[in-house]
Swiss-Prot record:
The chain crosses the membrane at residues 16-36, 76-96. Its main location: membrane. It comes from Thioalkalivibrio sulfidiphilus (strain HL-EbGR7). The gene is mscL. This is Large-conductance mechanosensitive channel. HAMAP family: MscL. Pfam families: MscL. It is found in: Cell inner membrane.
Length: 134
C-alpha cells in the first residue's frame, strides 16, 4: 500500500498535472499548425514557385518492379515538417516571452504598504509603551 500512496501523491502534485495539460494542449496545437502549414501556407507558396505541390516532391531511388516496392526520398514532406517546426518554435518563443514579461511586471511592482493599524492596535501599543515606562 505504501507504493500506491506514494504514486497518488506524485500524480496529484501540481507540476505533474500542469505538465499533462501542457502536453495535451501542445499535441492539439501541433495538429493545428500542421494543418495551417499544409493547407494554408504551402499551397500559395507552391503556386508562387510554379504550381508545385510540396507533398509530391520526391526523388525516386528505385522504381517499382515485380515484387519490389518503389524507394523514394520524399523531401517535400520534410520541407513541410521544417515549416511546422519553425512556426511552432516561433509560437512557443512568443508565448514564453509574454509570460516572462508578465513575471517581470509582477516582480517590479512594489509590495503593497502594510495596512494602517486599527484603533484597537494603536490603543494596545500605547498601553504597552506605558507599561514599559513603569
Amino acid at each position: 500500500m505504501g507504493m500506491l500512496k506514494e504514486f497518488k501523491e506524485f500524480a496529484v502534485k501540481g507540476n505533474v498535472v500542469d505538465m499533462a495539460v501542457g502536453i495535451i494542449i501542445g499535441v492539439a496545437f501541433g495538429k493545428i499548425v500542421s494543418s495551417f502549414v499544409s493547407d494554408v501556407i504551402m499551397p500559395p507558396l507552391g503556386l508562387l514557385i510554379g504550381g508545385v505541390d510540396f507533398s509530391d516532391l520526391a526523388i525516386t531511388l528505385q522504381h517499382a518492379g515485380e515484387g519490389v516496392a518503389e524507394v523514394t526520398l520524399r523531401y517535400g514532406v520534410f520541407l513541410q515538417a521544417i515549416f511546422d517546426f519553425i512556426i511552432i518554435a516561433f509560437a512557443i518563443f512568443i508565448a514564453v516571452k509574454a509570460i516572462n514579461t508578465l513575471k517581470k511586471k509582477e516582480e517590479a511592482a512594489p509590495p503593497p504598504a502594510p495596512p494602517e493599524p486599527s484603533s484597537e492596535e494603536k490603543l494596545l501599543a500605547e498601553i504597552r509603551d506605558l507599561l514599559k515606562q513603569k
